[in-house]
Every structure is written in structure tokens, then in C-alpha cells.
Regions:
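HhH-family (HhH-GPD) DNA N-glycosylase catalytic core used in base-excision repair
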Residues: 1-199
Length: 199
């Protein structure tokens, strides 16, 4: 058995089996996940995965340094790219997020150290989530969302942040009968915690 959502496409199966929930500590990979989740706003994750390589090409292999330096010419280039999500507002937001990401790195040493301090460096296994009872947001994603917005990040509401935390492994939301659930618990430090829902 596996998480129910994984079987919708080849891209979703690969993403579930190889990436989703695996603790991630490389800053550029964290920026990639944050950008993908932010670009997803109002869209399906399956669509984002289908367009992932286009997004990678448009956003300089998800290099925050390069994206932060994008100009109006780059925005025009992206808008004219085939298969791209053509939202000027989102594209500008990703450039702003890259700038905020670099500022946070400078302040905290790395985005990794900033993010993982919220869980003391451990993957969080919320009680009940392994049964498939996952919220769209919780108190943790509310707190991180609030802090990111204060730092100038855009498209980082609590629902998007919750999905980001699932993606980068800070939250292990695989279902208990999914092989990945126990595999990740055996391979990485984790902590079982009681869910606290946001208001």
C-alpha cells in the first residue's frame, strides 16, 4: 500500500517515492521546493510536476542568486516560454522571494538552519496523520508563514507553507501503510508530536 494520492500519474508516483517527505537540507533544493509550491497556488500539484523542467529552465535551475537578479527582460522571456505558467504576478513574486531568501541566508547562515530550527532538526510525525487525517495547514505552518511574510516572502500562506514542509520532510505525512513512512522514520531523526490545529 502507499499514500492514496500518489497513483495519479508517473510523475506523481516518482515524486512520492523518491522525494516527498525526504528531509532536505540543501538550500538550493529548499528554494526549488518553495518556488514550486508557491507557483502551485490555485493550480494542481500534478500540473506543477508536468511543468517542472520548464520551471527549472525559466528560473535558472532554481538558483536564488540568479533569480534574484532577474530583470524585466527575464520576465518577458519567461512569459513567452512555451508550457510555462504565464502569471506575471507569480513570476515577480518568485523574484522577490529569491531576494528574501538571500537576505534570510545572510541573517541566519543558511535557509536550512532557519527552517529546521522550527522542529529541532527532526522530522515531525503528527499523531493521526499516519491514518490519512492530514490538515491543509496547522499551527506550525501558520507560524512559519507569518515569519516568512514578515521577511518579504510572497505566496507563502499557511496552506502553501504546510505543503512545503511536507515536501522537504520537516513533516512526515506518509500514511502508516505506505513503505515510505517507516523507511523515513528509520533513516532520519524524527519526533512524534500532537497536532495543534490553527484557528
Amino acid at each position: 500500500m502507499a499514500c492514496q494520492w500518489k497513483n495519479s500519474s508517473a510523475e506523481m508516483i516518482s515524486y512520492h517515492d523518491k522525494e516527498w517527505g525526504v528531509p532536505t537540507h540543501e538550500d538550493q533544493k529548499l528554494f526549488e521546493y518553495l518556488l514550486l509550491e508557491s507557483m502551485q497556488a490555485g493550480l494542481s500539484w500534478a500540473l506543477i510536476l508536468r511543468k517542472r523542467e520548464t520551471l527549472r529552465s525559466c528560473f535558472a535551475n532554481f538558483s536564488p542568486e540568479k533569480v534574484a537578479a532577474f530583470t524585466e527582460e527575464d520576465i518577458a522571456r519567461i512569459m513567452h516560454t512555451e508550457n510555462m505558467i504565464k502569471s506575471v504576478r507569480k513570476i515577480r513574486a518568485m523574484i522577490q522571494n529569491a531576494k528574501a531568501f538571500l537576505a534570510l541566508q545572510k541573517e541566519e547562515g543558511s535557509f536550512d538552519s532557519y527552517l529546521w530550527k522550527f522542529s529541532d532538526g527532526k522530522s515531525l510525525c503528527y499523531q493521526g496523520h499516519e491514518k490519512g487525517n492530514m490538515p491543509s495547514k496547522n499551527a506550525l505552518s501558520e507560524a512559519i508563514s507569518k515569519d516568512l511574510k514578515k521577511r518579504g516572502f510572497q505566496y507563502t500562506g499557511p496552506v502553501i507553507v504546510y505543503s512545503f514542509l511536507q515536501a522537504c520532510g520537516l513533516i512526515n505525512d506518509h500514511e502508516e501503510d505506505c513503505p515510505c513512512y517507516q523507511t523515513l522514520r528509520k533513516a532520519y531523526p524524527y519526533q512524534e508530536v500532537e497536532e495543534i490545529f490553527s484557528c
